[in-house]
Amino acid sequence: KIQSGNDLTSGTGTYTVTFTNPFYSDNYAVGISAQGLATGDYYSLGSKTINGFNIAFKNSGGSGVSRTFDYLAKGY
């Protein structure tokens, strides 16, 4: 099963991606393509469940920043 999202805006906090159709297991792969990152920006994924996952973008100082991203999730 593959699920994806395009041009999502994270906001400055934690963004929750919710799948339309849950996976059977939380052992799926997630690929992220971030747009408009500044030097030193990074993201972290967390709370992967069968229903979705969380993502947060931060700048080099560790403060939350709003960024646009695409994702692709593949699993069972």
Segments (PLM) and residue ranges:
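Extracellular attachment/recognition segments
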Residues: 1-76
